[in-house]
Regions:
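Active-site metal-coordination/substrate-binding segment of hydrolases
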Residues: 66-148, 153-164, 201-204, 315-318, ...
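Active-site-adjacent substrate-binding region
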Residues: 220, 227-229, 234-250, 402-445
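Substrate-recognition/cap regions that form aromatic- and gly/pro-loop-enriched pockets
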Residues: 342-431
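Acidic, glycine-rich active-site loops and adjacent beta-strand->loop/helix elements
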Residues: 78-80, 141-149, 171-174, 213, ...
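His/Asp/Glu-rich mid-to-C-terminal helical/loop segments that flank catalytic regions of hydrolases
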Residues: 38, 158-159, 225-242, 271-277, ...
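Zn-dependent metallopeptidase/amidohydrolase metal-coordination segment
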Residues: 9-10, 337, 344-346, 350-359, ...
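Midchain, well-structured core segments that form catalytic/ion-binding scaffolds
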Residues: 104-107, 147-148, 154-366
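Acidic/His- and Gly-rich active-site-bordering loop/insert found
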Residues: 3-105
Length: 486
């Protein structure tokens, strides 16, 4: 790892981030980072333990003169989203993140950076290690598996935490203070299909959709970005309708909370239609590229011939699945009527897999209104059940209802305005912060979320602003010294 990362200011923050990013920490595979964090806490002589689900808690007493302040919980999640470009050779299970400086940004070579939520975790580590930063009594809460199920937050029991104020460090714009967030639910459709013999006189093709930006399926869902699964399905729908295309297999998207950037489909077409099919596809490709020319300038759609496969998908099942995906809502479903520019409800068709007689379609539906969340989830369920799929609604977690009378909110607003000569944006976000879940068992805890500027989270374009990290660090230090008295 380049020494240039460790030389960035504030060094305490960037050095801890570099230490953390040397440890592989995929969601649901956090064993190494859990041990890393426990060893870190123990090495400082601080009370360190894990709960039943393996969240790590480290307690640090108040510094002299701060004993009369309310105890705080500083919270971040240990896992990170693992995404890489198709041509990047990298093993997230064994390798640390390869970071570099690009102007005002810290990036990773061909992969996600892990600033979500690594910079938040590194902040807490730096505070725990410090000897000269005034602060009240701190409980550091490092949760597991935030990115693929909110498992740590959902299974944290009441009575473990003693703090009265929670500072969540998982917001990704430094001029925002978050006081609310969306809940979510996974919608997973599955079914089997029979494989049929390839008709005589067929030609094989591989269709590849790539070059899309991808991004966070909550925070970026309103940016007009392309969804590789929906684009691929549009191509398949047209070719099936006009030329009788048959699907061999599809592999689209990866993670439920990332807007899919790539999809690959193997198909066959009758040789007698091949020339007309290619001509028609090129026209549709040109149309799609024109539609996305502003938001997706690097979109690439390629069709190349391949060896003829042995089997193809059952035509009846294929038609149903293609039509269901076409009908399934993707993107913003409803904007909030209560907060300007806030997405209320959305869906991301994250994963489409067709292979070896098995179909899987995975969606993540989000909403800040619980009833609207289930309304859209049931609409999706209905579309897929109509074509013979079994549909599971799972992993539901609640949103976080804003408290505009929060005491800690007033503290943060005053500090931000004093430091930056402007008011912060007090917002709710269309993402799954853990605050809403934690508030279920700790309803009296005063919660707030903020953080440094991070762009492109959940994609290989993820980057963290160096100047923003400096601004954010000063903000954190001032907050710690101004926590309200008990």
């Amino acid at each position: 790892m380049s020494q240039e990362i460790r030389n960035l200011e504030p060094k305490a923050l960037w050095n801890k981030f570099a230490d953390l990013n040397a440890v592989p920490r995929p969601s649901k595979k956090e064993e190494r980072v859990i041990e890393f964090m426990k060893n870190f806490g123990s090495s400082l002589g601080l009370e360190t333990f894990e709960d039943e689900i393996r969240n790590v808690i480290i307690r640090k007493p108040a510094t002299p003169g701060m004993e009369n302040r309310k105890a705080i919980v500083m919270q971040g999640h240990l896992d990170m989203v693992h995404q890489k470009n198709g041509d990047t050779v990298f093993d997230f299970d064994t390798q640390g993140i390869d970071m570099y400086v690009d102007g005002d940004w810290v990036r990773a070579r061909g992969t996600t950076l892990g600033a979500d939520n690594g910079l938040g975790v590194a902040t807490i580590m730096a505070i725990l290690e410090s000897t000269d930063i005034p602060h009240p009594a701190i409980e550091a809460l490092f949760t597991i598996d935030e990115e693929t199920g909110m498992t740590g937050a959902l299974n944290l029991k009441g009575g473990i935490l003693q703090g009265q104020i929670l500072l969540n460090l998982d917001t990704e714009e430094d001029d925002e203070i978050d006081i609310g967030c969306a809940g979510g639910i996974d919608v997973t459709a599955t079914r089997t299909y029979h494989e049929e013999e390839v008709p005589e006189g067929s030609v094989g093709h591989i269709i590849t959709v790539k070059g899309l930006n991808g991004g966070h399926s909550g925070m970026d869902i309103n940016k007009g970005l392309g969804n590789a699964n929906k684009i691929m399905n549009r191509l398949l729908f047209d070719a099936f309708e006009n030329f009788g295309l048959q699907v061999v297999e599809i592999n689209g998207g990866s993670l439920r909370n990332a807007i899919p950037r790539e999809s690959v489909a193997k198909v066959i077409i009758s040789e007698m239609f091949d020339e007309a099919y290619i001509f028609d596809m090129q026209e549709i490709i040109n149309d799609i590229k024109a539609e996305y020319k502003t938001t997706e300038p690097n979109l690439s759609i390629e069709i190349v011939k391949c060896d003829l496969p042995e089997k193809v998908m059952d035509l009846g099942v294929q038609e149903g699945i293609i039509r269901a995906i076409y009908a399934a809502h993707n993107g913003v479903y409803r904007m909030s009527a209560d907060m300007d520019d806030l997405v209320e409800t959305s869906n991301n068709i994250a994963r489409v897999i067709v292979k070896d007689g098995e179909i899987l379609i995975g969606c993540l539906t989000r909403s800040s209104v619980e009833t609207s969340k289930f309304d859209l989830a049931n609409a999706l369920r209905s579309a897929f059940e109509l074509v013979g799929c079994e549909v599971e609604l799972s992993g539901s977690y609640p949103g976080w209802t804003p408290n505009v009378n929060s005491e800690i909110l007033e503290v943060l607003k005053e500090i931000y305005e004093k430091q930056n000569n402007e008011k912060p944006k007090v917002v709710a976000c269309h993402a799954g912060l853990e605050c809403g879940i934690l508030g279920t068992n700790y309803p009296e805890m005063d919660m707030i979320s903020f953080g440094p500027t991070i762009h492109g989270a959940h994609s290989p374009d993820e980057r963290a602003s160096i100047s923003s990290a400096q601004k954010y660090w000063k903000f954190v230090l001032e907050i710690l010294s101004n926590i309200p008295v008990k």
